Amino acid sequence: MFIIPFAVRSTGIRNKKVMTPLSVLAIGSRAVGLWTEKPQAGVVRVIHLDDLDVLEDVTILLYGRLSFMSARAHLTVRYNTVSRACLEPALLELRERLAGAQQAVPGDDNATGLPFKWNRLVRSSLARLHEEAPASFRFASVPPRSRREAPLGHLLLLNPYELVYMRDPPDTEVRHGVDTFIIPRSRLEAVAGHAMDTRIRARGSISLLPMPPLLREAAARWFP
């Protein structure tokens, strides 16, 4: 379980602290659930793993947001990324449970030439699930909206178990973070271009992800 405190205060005894929880996220072997204390105590939502189709994992400096999506439910929790290391093992274990059987990858692409941030991310377990797993990927940079901003990076990666889409956070000038969508290949039903987006159907869940042309073309080749 992952406790997200509303307040933390010291007891004055041996540096012990008391936490007043705002919410508790539970990631189990059969379901993901969220309990909240406000506006009233009780279970907010439970999504069984058999129904879970898409994960969105956002980190921007100290801000973290996790979304668990199915055709009928959407569960979102916000947290401080100082505690990210405590959460990551449970997230990786959840992805393992959703992964299904290993599937073929068109090729194992080389990360040489990618910007430093993306070179690191493309080799990570966040992108590959297993760091040593083969992966096909495409990377593109989109020009910034203003001179104050850096180019917006987009990465689409196919590993043996998942389709992973990563991008710089689009709603902030800060590029110290990443917005990641993870779709288990066992859930994928259709991938198609839709105007400036890629439309991904994972069983009953439909996601419209804004991708540059190079990434949309790669998705069309991988899932004709």
Please report, for each region that a protein language model flagged, where it lies by residue.
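Long, acidic/polar, low-complexity amphipathic helices and coiled-coil-like
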Residues: 21-25, 37
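Extracellular/lumenal glycan-associated surfaces
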Residues: 27-34, 159-164
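DNA polymerase sliding clamps and clamp-related checkpoint/processivity subunits
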Residues: 34-48
